[in-house]
UniProtKB/Swiss-Prot annotation:
Record's keyword terms, sorted: Signal
Family annotation (InterPro entries): ABC_trnspt_W-bd_WtpA (IPR022498), ModA/WtpA (IPR050682)
GO BP, one annotated term: molybdate ion transport
NCBIfam families on file: PRK04168.1 (NF003196), tungstate_WtpA (TIGR03730)
Natural source organism: Staphylothermus marinus (strain ATCC 43588 / DSM 3639 / JCM 9404 / F1)
UniProt record similarity statement: Belongs to the bacterial solute-binding protein 1 family. WtpA subfamily.
Domain of life: Archaea
Protein name in the entry: Uncharacterized solute-binding protein Smar_0280
Disulfide bonds: none
MF GO annotations: molybdate ion binding; tungstate binding
One family name in Pfam for this protein: SBP_bac_11
Signal peptide (UniProt feature, chain positions): 1-22
């Protein structure tokens, strides 16, 4: 009887073994063959909304999973350079960060593709917004009021942050009023200033601090300030115009001479240099210039082929339409550096 039962069990055991092997083989096949059907993107926070929409359309069309991790642009880059994390695409709010931090060790090429400008966002709950709406040139005087809370993002982590610092420096030159710099930056933070010939250098320590009881609020990335403005926790924040449009916030435009959105004033913008991460081996000097977003695929991208296909899709008509709608229009001609991969040359052109 025992022998008979053992004979019955044997086919069952063999069947289970076959099933387990088949399952493991299937899992191995799935994990190894779906690995190329995903893309990992580290992106600037201000790119999150248009990238999400483009990724959704691409995924729907090609069945590819796209993971977008948003942060400040400098922080996005340091995830790769300092933390050793894997990514396929890096998309930043200042294309110059790519040659500064990533070329030549992580990539040999990049594309500058979209523009923006910095504005001051607010709501109907913001103190003195009626004055601002009637007299936009009073913006810096309103920010100087002790009962007004305002903010910008961390210049050591986010381009909108160092651009906000630079804009305050440019405003002090444009309005010929040194009190702007003193009251909005120097008296509220440990940021320092030095004048070198006609250039204003604003020095941002790596351990940036805000004075106690200050009405200035700093957050890691510019989009982190949106919820504070919407809730009335702060009255005003420096943001990209695209962020204001995407979040349906009121905003006032700053003069073209200081908003970093008009290439005509590139020379004037360059009168201010912001030094970030001062006191570390990562210290960089960033001259103010017109805002241009940049993008690249890393040399060691784990899903390089798929990432290049997605980038071609992004730089094409679909991407152009979405970015235009979100307030970040594409350049008439892309800025191209390095030997662009063959897959992109028909749409991005050659090195300029």
């Amino acid at each position: 009887m025992a022998i008979y039962l053992d004979k019955l069990k044997m086919p069952i055991i063999i069947g289970l073994i076959v099933l387990i092997i088949a399952s493991l083989t299937g899992y191995y096949y799935y994990t190894h063959n779906t690995k190329t059907s995903e893309i990992i993107i580290f992106a600037a926070g201000s790119l999150k909304i248009p990238l999400d929409e483009i990724a959704s359309k691409y995924s729907e069309k090609y069945g590819v999973n796209i993971y977008i991790e948003a942060s400040g642009s400098v922080e996005a880059i340091r995830k790769v350079t300092d933390l050793g994390r894997e990514a396929d695409i890096i998309a930043v709010a200042d294309y110059r960060l790519i040659p500064t931090f990533l070329v030549p060790n992580y990539t040999s090429w990049y594309i500058g593709f979209a523009t923006n400008q910095v504005v001051l966002v607010y709501t109907d709950k913001s103190k003195y917004h009626e004055i601002l709406e009637n007299n936009p040139s009073e913006w810096y005087k309103i920010l100087m009021r002790n009962d007004v809370k305002w903010g910008f993002s961390d210049p050591n982590k986010d381009p909108c942050g160092y651009r906000s610092v630079g804009i305050i420096g440019l405003a002090s030159i444009y309005y010929n009023d040194t009190s702007i710099l003193e009251n909005l930056l120097l008296n509220k933070t440990n940021i320092a200033v030095e004048k070198v010939n006609d250039t204003l250098n604003l020095i941002v320590p790596a351990d940036l601090k805000v004075s106690e009881n200050s009405n200035l609020i700093i957050r890691s990335k510019s989009v982190d300030l949106i919820s504070l403005v919407e809730a009335g926790t702060i009255d005003y924040a420096f943001e990209y115009q695209s962020v204001a449009v995407q979040h349906h916030l009121k905003y006032i435009k700053l003069p073209d001479q200081i908003n970093l959105g008009n290439p005509k004033y590139a020379y004037f913008y360059g009168k201010v240099i912001v030094k970030i991460l001062v006191g570390t081996d990562k210290e960089k000097s960033i001259a103010m210039s017109p805002i241009i977003y940049g993008i690249t695929v890393l040399d060691n991208a784990p899903h390089r082929s798929e990432a290049l296909k997605f980038l071609k899709f992004l730089l094409g008509n679909t991407g152009r339409e979405i970015f235009e709608e979100k307030g970040q229009p594409y350049l008439d001609e892309f800025i191209v550096y390095g030997k662009i991969p063959e897959e992109l040359r028909s749409i991005a052109g050659s090195e300029s």
